[in-house]
């Protein structure tokens, strides 16, 4: 007779593989699963976990944010390769791009062109695995998760200043009671 485990029919909550059917992503998962198992490196485990994540949990990061992060750190971290498990985007407000070494899942066309023009280097995650199998001389960064427009609406309640989902955005809609002091109360 078998033993009935307490959590018998309960699935594990964390992902063990990406939901996407993208073959290139699956190859990267295969590679980093091997590296996470064979090397005693927390870096590879972190990369693998992030490869499993949904697109909303892999937010983009701009080259201006990466430049700010690398310049703010000490001189030793300026020579490191910045690793992003997500998209690296361009920032037109940034007039001059410093020399950067970035490895990412993907780059926008303009971001790639500007990094290369500045004398920097653009790496894919499989090229990074050849160069730094244990993640040495790298710094792992990610974009802001709450920058999406949808986050403006989450957690609605009194005194939260969250944006309502409105039918229309005219003068008569969502502008009176509860939105201004002169009409009963303001949250």
UniProtKB/Swiss-Prot annotation:
Database matches in InterPro entries: Ribosomal_eL18, Ribosomal_eL18/eL18-A/B/_CS, Ribosomal_uL15/eL18, Ribosomal_uL15/eL18_sf
Nucleotidyltransferase in keyword set: no
Listed GO CC annotations: cytosol; cytosolic large ribosomal subunit; preribosome
Modified residues (Phosphothreonine): 87, 89, 134, 138
Modified residues (Phosphoserine): 16, 64, 136
PROSITE patterns per UniProt: RIBOSOMAL_L18E
Main location: cytoplasm
Keyword terms, alphabetized: Cytoplasm, Phosphoprotein, Ribonucleoprotein, Ribosomal protein
Record's subcellular location: Cytoplasm
GO biological process, one term: cytoplasmic translation
Molecular-function GO terms, alphabetical: RNA binding; structural constituent of ribosome
Additional observations: There are 2 genes for eL18 in S.pombe.
Family: Belongs to the eukaryotic ribosomal protein eL18 family.
Function: Component of the ribosome, a large ribonucleoprotein complex responsible for the synthesis of proteins in the cell. The small ribosomal subunit (SSU) binds messenger RNAs (mRNAs) and translates the encoded message by selecting cognate aminoacyl-transfer RNA (tRNA) molecules. The large subunit (LSU) contains the ribosomal catalytic site termed the peptidyl transferase center (PTC), which catalyzes the formation of peptide bonds, thereby polymerizing the amino acids delivered by tRNAs into a polypeptide chain.
PANTHER family: 60S RIBOSOMAL PROTEIN L18, LARGE RIBOSOMAL SUBUNIT PROTEIN EL18
Complex and partners: Component of the large ribosomal subunit (LSU). Mature yeast ribosomes consist of a small (40S) and a large (60S) subunit. The 40S small subunit contains 1 molecule of ribosomal RNA (18S rRNA) and at least 33 different proteins. The large 60S subunit contains 3 rRNA molecules (25S, 5.8S and 5S rRNA) and at least 46 different proteins. eL18 interacts with NAP1.
Protein name: Large ribosomal subunit protein eL18A
Origin species: Schizosaccharomyces pombe (strain 972 / ATCC 24843) (Fission yeast)
């Amino acid at each position: 007779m078998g033993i009935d485990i307490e959590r018998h029919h309960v699935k594990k909550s964390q992902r063990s593989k990406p939901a996407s059917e993208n073959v290139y992503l699956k190859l990267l998962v295969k590679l980093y699963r091997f590296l996470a198992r064979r090397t005693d490196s927390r870096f590879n485990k972190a990369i693998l976990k992030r490869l499993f994540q949904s697109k909303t949990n892999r937010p983009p990061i701009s080259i201006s944010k990466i430049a700010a992060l690398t310049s703010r750190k000490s001189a030793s971290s300026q020579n490191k390769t910045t690793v992003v498990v997500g998209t690296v985007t361009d920032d037109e407000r940034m007039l001059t791009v410093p020399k950067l070494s970035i490895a990412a899942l993907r780059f926008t066309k303009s971001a790639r062109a500007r990094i290369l023009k500045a004398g920097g280097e653009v790496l894919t995650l499989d090229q990074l695995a050849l160069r730094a199998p244990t993640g040495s001389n790298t710094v792992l960064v990610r974009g802001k998760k709450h920058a999406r427009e949808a986050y403006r609406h989450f957690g609605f309640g009194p005194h939260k200043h969250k944006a309502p989902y409105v039918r229309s955005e005219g003068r008569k809609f969502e502008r009176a009671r509860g939105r201004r002091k002169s009409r009963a109360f303001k949250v």
